């Protein structure tokens, strides 16, 4: 499990990106690159990293469900994800 501080840091980045999205878009369209440099570093969407919503694990992220592969497997085996079942052929 990821440290709580890492999860909180990622949430803070998401809020910062959302806060400056419109301003960032306007600066890009105007070609004001110096204005872009004055924005906070965390206002850039490139700095965001997908993390598991339950454990905060940064790797093995499944976008469709928003959780890591490990958490997905546990939940699917326990029948906690509707419509997902183990494949057999």
Curated annotation (Swiss-Prot):
GO terms for cellular component: cytoplasm; small ribosomal subunit. Pfam families: Ribosomal_S14. One of its GO terms (biological process) is translation. One of its GO terms (molecular function) is rRNA binding. Gene3D superfamilies: 30s Ribosomal Protein S14, Chain N (4.10.830.10). PROSITE patterns: RIBOSOMAL_S14. SUPFAM superfamilies: Glucocorticoid receptor-like (DNA-binding domain). Keywords: Ribonucleoprotein, Ribosomal protein, RNA-binding, rRNA-binding. Belongs to the universal ribosomal protein uS14 family. Part of the 30S ribosomal subunit. Contacts proteins S3 and S10. Binds 16S rRNA, required for the assembly of 30S particles and may also be responsible for determining the conformation of the 16S rRNA at the A site. This is Small ribosomal subunit protein uS14.
């Amino acid at each position: 499990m990821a440290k709580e501080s890492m999860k909180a840091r990622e949430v803070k980045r998401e809020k910062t990106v959302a806060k400056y999205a419109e301003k960032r878009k306007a600066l890009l369209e105007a070609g004001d690159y110096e204005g872009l440099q004055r924005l906070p570093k965390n206002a850039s969407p490139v700095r965001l990293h997908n993390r598991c919503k339950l454990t905060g694990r940064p790797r093995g992220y499944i976008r469709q469900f928003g959780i890591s592969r490990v958490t997905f497997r546990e939940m699917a085996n326990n029948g906690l994800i509707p419509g997902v079942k183990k494949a057999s052929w």
